[in-house]
Amino acid sequence: MPASNDPVRYPKRPHVRRHGPAGYDDVESFRPWLRDEFQFRCVYCLEREVWTKPVAAFDIDHHAAVGGNPGLQFDYDNLLYVCHACNLSKGSQAVPDPLQAMLSSAVIVKKNGELEGKTPPAKKLIACLRLNRVAYKERRQLIRAIVSLASKFDLDLLAKMLGYPANLPDLSQLRPPTNRRPAGIRKSCYARRAAGRLPDTY
């Protein structure tokens, strides 16, 4: 499968945050920002909203535990968008930053769906979150098979599997008390779609 069409291939480069809302006093207020920030998928296993039921399936995770450092509770740069399964597996464990560790150069996704970590941080993350459980490996194989078949026989299905969700958040309508990176709103998926610059798939 071409790398451009591989839905379980990790990013090439470390993620640089484009949004910076601050001042909220509840974590849920960050959700629309995090959805857009992390492309509507889990930063750990790459599960996408369009493959599941996002309302119940995705959580907001504090990368560094809040206990002992309450200032991190509402720190946007400490928040991640993750699937519920990965969030449960992580729990309160201290793990490497997935935005730095889970890169295509550090994680090989084998044909059988198994993740092979090539660096110590990637290996630790894969082990701590148990990303090579049978269910995870079978899920990767299934998603790859669907995308492969759709690319040959059903381009509409391919667009759904690799496309953005319909309910993109309009971040320009949100009013956080402060925003350290306001320019990011113009780079949001909603804004790019409105300007005709959002790709059909990713």
What does each model-found stretch correspond to?
Residues 6-7, 50-51, 73, 77-93, ...:
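Short, surface-exposed, charge-dense and proline/glycine-enriched linear segments
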Residues 90-157:
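Conserved, surface-exposed functional patches that form binding/active-site neighborhoods
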Residues 47-81, 92-108:
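Histidine-centered nuclease catalytic patch
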Residues 2-44, 67-74:
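Short, charged surface segments at domain edges that flank catalytic/cofactor-binding sites
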